[in-house]
Regions:
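Mature catalytic core of soluble alpha/beta enzymes
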Residues: 2-323
């Protein structure tokens, strides 16, 4: 797994001067650049995310993040309490349709001034790749977690994989959250509460609305989604933050179990995401012994145009959770 993560870092990091993505961004406006199969896959995954979300998840936001001061690893940028000297600047987004990819030639061409940021998809894609490789070698059920994004492969342990969902995956057990179990597929959380810093007099975060070039200012501070893969879960959770109030109907239409935390801290559960408290009682009364199964393995969303797969085998409550 460490080899997979290291390979993605070398190919897809925006913060490494020696990364392949940095070389691609530096070549913007020039001739198409031949890239490795890994970076080609990562760029195509990012463009797929843009297409499936109508541009709400757009990899051409790199320049907007740089304008906000997110031009180096977040550990160096700092968090709320750390300041970027310049006032908030908003950069125009060129748009994902300006990226030209030739899969047969393995080339990518960026328009002049475009800088790709693959943060919304590359980590989740790495989790899916890592868990597939681990399953191939281990021959048993595997769960991989990369920075709060989860991918599974193979048969789960009895009762499923226990995962604690919170605003911040680094938080301790004293923080509000919920225990759930996942039997297959992927789970991802997108949040405006973790990567935050001061730019001028404003507090900003890394989830950019491509329509404005500024941090998304929607109804939700955190969204968790279960889907058929970690990549699809992260695409949906990121898009939901950007879409704001429009996200509820969209997630429902895709039958993607979701947990949405509003800016005031109130929580919404959609499309079969288990509620707190009484779900186990209901399941015991039914006698099914399998909890709140919400989707069938491999089922695509109704109508199919989105291409985002529904949760592979269900999300279930793990006790009453935490308040």
């Amino acid at each position: 797994m460490t080899e997979v993560v290291a390979a993605f870092d070398r190919a897809c990091s925006r913060f490494r001067q020696d990364s392949e993505l940095t070389g691609l961004n530096d070549a913007a406006g020039r001739a198409p650049l031949r890239v490795s199969p890994l970076l080609l896959d990562a760029v195509m995954a990012a463009l797929r995310a843009a297409r499936l979300t109508g541009g709400d998840v757009d990899p051409t936001i790199g320049q907007a993040l740089i304008a906000l001061g997110y031009d180096r690893d977040f550990g160096s940028v700092g968090s709320v309490g750390s300041a970027v000297a310049d006032p908030v600047r908003v950069a125009a987004i060129a748009g994902w349709r300006t990226v030209r990819v030739d899969p047969e030639a393995s080339t990518v061409r960026l328009a002049w001034g475009v800088k790709l940021d693959l943060g919304a998809t590359a980590k989740a894609l790495a989790a899916d790749r890592a868990v597939a490789l681990a399953f191939q070698h281990a021959g048993c059920g595997v769960l991989v977690s990369l920075g709060g994004d989860f991918a599974t492969s193979g048969a789960p342990p009895p009762g499923g994989w226990s995962i604690r969902v919170t605003d911040d995956h680094r938080s301790g057990f004293e923080e509000p959250g919920q225990w759930i179990t996942v039997r297959s597929g992927g789970l991802a959380t997108s949040s405006t509460t973790v990567r935050r810093w001061h730019a001028g007099e404003r507090t900003v975060h890394h989830l950019i609305d491509p329509r404005t070039g500024a941090p998304a200012r929607g109804a939700w501070r955190t969204v968790s989604v279960a889907a058929g893969s970690c990549l699809d879960a992260n695409i949906a959770s990121t898009a939901a933050i950007v879409r704001g109030e429009r996200a509820e109907a969209w997630l429902q239409s895709l039958a993607l179990p979701s947990r949405l935390v509003a800016v005031d801290g109130s929580v919404r559960h959609l499309a079969g995401w288990p509620s707190q408290g009484d779900d186990l009682t209901s399941c015991a009364a039914i006698g099914a012994g399998t909890g709140m199964t919400v989707a069938t393995a491999g089922v695509e969303s109704a109508g199919g145009p989105t291409g985002i797969s529904a949760a592979a085998a269900g999300v279930q409550p793990m006790g009453a959770g935490l308040a």
